[in-house]
C-alpha cells in the first residue's frame, strides 16, 4: 500500500481499528468504545448545516399492549448535529420512550427548531410505523421535511458505532 494511504487511514480510523486493519492486531478493546478525553466542548460554529438522525425504538403504546417492561427496552434517539465540512458539532441528543404521536412531534420539533429541512430515520419496521404519524404532524403544523431512509447495511449496532464514530472522536 502507498504510504500516503496508510497515513490517511491512521488519521481517520480509531487506533484500535487501524491496528486491526493494518497491523493484524486483534486485541479486545476493554474500557469502552469512547474515552472521556475524546469529548470536547465548544461554542456552536457559525457555519454549517443541521442534520437530524433518528434511531427509533419501541413506542410506549405498543409496548403496553405486549406487556413489555419499560426498563428493559431501548430508547428512541434523535441526534441534532451541525456539520461544517468535516467537522461535527452535536447540539443535542433527545432520547426517551414516548408513544408514537409524541415521537413524531419530537422529531418534527427538533427539525423546526434548527431549521433543518430533512430528517434521516433508520430503516426498518419502526421507521415504517412512524412515517404516517410524522406525515400527519407535518400536515397539522404545515412544516414539511424530506424524510431520508438511513440504511445500516446489516451491520450490528455496536459495529456501526465503532466504525463510524470511534475514529472521528479519537482524532477530533
Model-derived features: where do they sit?
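Intrinsic structural disorder
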Residues: 1-2, 7, 71, 122, ...
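Mg2+-dependent endonuclease catalytic cores in nucleic-acid-processing enzymes, primarily RNase H-like
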Residues: 29, 67, 79-172
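Short coil-to-beta strand junction motifs in C2/discoidin
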Residues: 70-76
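Generic structural signal for beta-strand residues in well-ordered domains
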Residues: 44-45, 71, 112
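Short beta-strand micro-motifs in enzyme catalytic cores
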Residues: 52, 76-77
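Alpha-helix initiation and N-capping motif
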Residues: 2-6, 15-19, 75, 87, ...
Amino acid at each position: 500500500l502507498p504510504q500516503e494511504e496508510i497515513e490517511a487511514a491512521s488519521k481517520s480510523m480509531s487506533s484500535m481499528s487501524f491496528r486491526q486493519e493494518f497491523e493484524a492486531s486483534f486485541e479486545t478493546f476493554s474500557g469502552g468504545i469512547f474515552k472521556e478525553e475524546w469529548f470536547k466542548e465548544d461554542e456552536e460554529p457559525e457555519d454549517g448545516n443541521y442534520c437530524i438522525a433518528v434511531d427509533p425504538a419501541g413506542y410506549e403504546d405498543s409496548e403496553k399492549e405486549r406487556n413489555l417492561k419499560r426498563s428493559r427496552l431501548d430508547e428512541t434517539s434523535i441526534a441534532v448535529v451541525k456539520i461544517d465540512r468535516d467537522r461535527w458539532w452535536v447540539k443535542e441528543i433527545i432520547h426517551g420512550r414516548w408513544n408514537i404521536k409524541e415521537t413524531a412531534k419530537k422529531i418534527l420539533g427538533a427539525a423546526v427548531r434548527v431549521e433543518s429541512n430533512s430528517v434521516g430515520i433508520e430503516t426498518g419496521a419502526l421507521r415504517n410505523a412512524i412515517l404516517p404519524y410524522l406525515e400527519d404532524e407535518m400536515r397539522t403544523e404545515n412544516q414539511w421535511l424530506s424524510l431520508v431512509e438511513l440504511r445500516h447495511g446489516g451491520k450490528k449496532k455496536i459495529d456501526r458505532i465503532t466504525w463510524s464514530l470511534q475514529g472521528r472522536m479519537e482524532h477530533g
